[in-house]
Amino acid sequence: MALLLNSTITVAMKQNPLVAVSFPRTTCLGSSFSPPRLLRVSCVATNPSKTSEETDKKKFRPIKEVPNQVTHTITQEKLEIFKSMENWAQENLLSYLKPVEASWQPQDFLPETNDEDRFYEQVKELRDRTKEIPDDYFVVLVGDMITEEALPTYQTTLNTLDGVKDETGGSLTPWAVWVRAWTAEENRHGDLLNKYLYLSGRVDMRHVEKTIQYLIGSGMDSKFENNPYNGFIYTSFQERATFISHGNTAKLATTYGDTTLAKICGTIAADEKRHETAYTRIVEKLFEIDPDGTVQALASMMRKRITMPAHLMHDGRDDDLFDHYAAVAQRIGVYTATDYAGILEFLLRRWEVEKLGMGLSGEGRRAQDYLCTLPQRIRRLEERANDRVKLASKSKPSVSFSWIYGREVEL
């Protein structure tokens, strides 16, 4: 991935010409069009208003092509399962939420604003702590923060799930209450990291803010198919991934001497762990009620691959921004291919997939066999990929990140 990036402009033009450069659509008499050299022929614009309209529409499309998405695949019979689980969710799921009055808030970790002298003193202390932290760490921390800030997309996506979505925006079903309260808890994560990064002075906040706007506007390709089986499997995986990622940024912050930042990342990781436990409990209950349908859904999601929610990340410059951010995260050990396989192994053990027996159809048994051998296959692929990376790393490719004022970071 990194070795193909000979030029940002070249990559941008290859993957999405509209991002790199665009020219008016013309019909040229007697010559082919070869920008940017001026043409010495007469040209007649064809339907310029339509061209402008099409260009405007494309401005708001994701930077990456999103394939045709399948919708509403759950059967009525399986929808009834979620209806029957409402009492269970009321008693078991909502217990993983914390009351607002007992919850931490971003201001608990930030400089005090009610005392001007103390505020400036604490900001200076914060900047002194962060000024020696390397750029690659900030690239990953910014990427993590942007992922958290795209929370509107995640709430919207969860509310596409048939049988559990919030039908009114204020529904009192336990599923709807959970999604709103989970969103409220998650909202603090992006708020806190955003403010801390702003005060550090180490990142270009305008480019960070542009990336957030681009990402929320692009949405995500969840592959849920409006199916709550798929949705809760995905969130189980994703919450564990964010728990690992924030936990590792906490460890690195400690290494770099910023104990406050370490506490921030560790506190966020603890929230993610609690949310992971809640979502894995839902899937555990589904395995109890419908082992055949659940194991098939899990196999289906793994065949499609669990894609991180910020995979459509873009800053208006780098069409491969998410891949570059992920490559840096892999290199410094925040989130790696090893973690991906480890999460799958953890969930397979948690849900005792290998022990499933009675009640599985032929398709269910095939899904079980596929899942139980998948981690080993992923690790073999990972080893081959690592070998290729080692060979390629001799050239030490680097990429410029707008988030850190265009400075280059090794991939």
Swiss-Prot record:
Organ and tissue specificity: Preferentially expressed in roots and flowers.
Knockout-associated phenotype: Reduced omega-7 fatty acids accumulation in the endosperm. The endosperm oil of double mutant aad2-3 aad3-3 lacks omega-7 fatty acids.
Reaction(s) this enzyme catalyzes, per UniProt: octadecanoyl-[ACP] + 2 reduced [2Fe-2S]-[ferredoxin] + O2 + 2 H(+) = (9Z)-octadecenoyl-[ACP] + 2 oxidized [2Fe-2S]-[ferredoxin] + 2 H2O
Cellular localization per UniProt: Plastid, Chloroplast
Binding site for Fe cation 2: E186, E239, E272, H275
Enzyme class: oxidoreductase
Induction: Activated by MYB115 and MYB118 in the endosperm.
GO terms of biological process kind: fatty acid homeostasis; regulation of endosperm development; unsaturated fatty acid biosynthetic process
Cofactor binding description: Binds 2 Fe(2+) ions per subunit.
SUPFAM superfamilies: Ferritin-like (SSF47240)
Site (Confers substrate specificity): F224
Key word Magnesium present: no
Cofactor: Fe(2+)
Annotated metabolic or biological route of this protein: Lipid metabolism; fatty acid metabolism
Origin superkingdom: Eukaryota
Transit peptide: first to last position: 1-44
Subunit structure: Homodimer.
Family affiliation: Belongs to the fatty acid desaturase type 2 family.
Protein name as catalogued: Stearoyl-[acyl-carrier-protein] 9-desaturase 2, chloroplastic
Organism: Arabidopsis thaliana
